[in-house]
């Protein structure tokens, strides 16, 4: 699928590899051209050295002088794997100076992984260790780069990468340890603060409860409280008694005023007509109220036994009124004059114009003429003028009736025959 595209990395690489550069190589002389020495170094010296080293590695023969441990051991062993006094970084025993050994065997014996030895990390001086190790960690990378590049040219491609990876692992380990330690200390401080606050709350609650128990256990305090309660109860009873006495006094005053009014009424009636009201029920009631034999209780009349006498007084008043009415009627009958009987006149005297005794009504027009003439003679006006001002009995009834005054008009217009 990659070859289907217009241009990719594989096609560019194949084009670059298949390009014919034979003419360019022929123009370069092995030893006379200006670039011959450089080409000879690139094609023969470096290539031959790499081939020899590879053959020695395959045959497990002695290493080349450029891979001597004396040249790369101090830099590679001490700078790359850390100083001996650093506990967090891996340590490797340095090789003795001048010792000739197989570089392949030495390389196979290298411990590229992290050391699993015991690490004694103290939380108290982790900041000092980190500050002491930080400058050394920053110096590892340039020293390793210079040492490896100067001592072994063939391993220049992976030497810096290995050094950088080791430095990154060491730095990451220190940072992780620092973060974990910081988190642990923060959590510990938070837990300690929470426990202290919780303990203070518990202590305050305990003190409050203990104080309440002490107050409850104190007999003097309980006695004082009981005395206060008794004093309040006595005060409440005293207030209620005062209120009751005031109510009784008010009732007594009302009954006294009522009795005085009753005595005044009785005395005034006795002075007016003693013989008439002396034995009346009303006068008897007023005397009893004035002598406090009957008192007023709300809307009731109560005797000394506490019985309501309103019904009794009402019945006595009704009987007395009925007897008085009967006495008045009998007295009136005794003093009334006897009726006088008259003989009725004969019918012809009552109705002289009729034989049957029925008197006929006069003609209204004749009555009006006669009445107008009489008024005209008295007032000095003409008869016609009097006719205009004449009111019939019906008109007088309308004027003086309960419906109001009727309008004045000529009777001929209203009663047109």
Swiss-Prot record:
Residues 1-47, 65-101, 321-361 are annotated as: Disordered. It comes from the Eukaryota. Monoubiquitinated at Cys-4 by PEX2 during PEX20 passage through the PEX2-PEX10-PEX12 retrotranslocation channel: monoubiquitination acts as a signal for PEX20 extraction and is required for proper export from peroxisomes and recycling. When PEX5 recycling is compromised, polyubiquitinated at Lys-15 by PEX10 during its passage through the retrotranslocation channel, leading to its degradation. Residues 17-28, 340-361 have a biased composition (Basic and acidic residues). Changing residue 411 to G: Mislocalization of the non-PTS1/non-PTS2 acyl-CoA oxidases (Aox) izozymes. Does not afect import of PTS1-containing proteins. Residues 1-15, 37-47, 323-336 have a biased composition (Polar residues). It is found in: Cytoplasm, Cytosol; Peroxisome matrix. A motif (WxxxF/Y motif 2) lies at residues 126-130, 411-415. Interacts (via WxxxF/Y and LVxEF motifs) with PEX14; promoting translocation through the PEX13-PEX14 docking complex. Interacts with PEX7. Belongs to the peroxisomal targeting signal receptor family. The WxxxF/Y motifs mediate interaction with PEX14, promoting association with the PEX13-PEX14 docking complex. This is Peroxisome biogenesis protein 20.
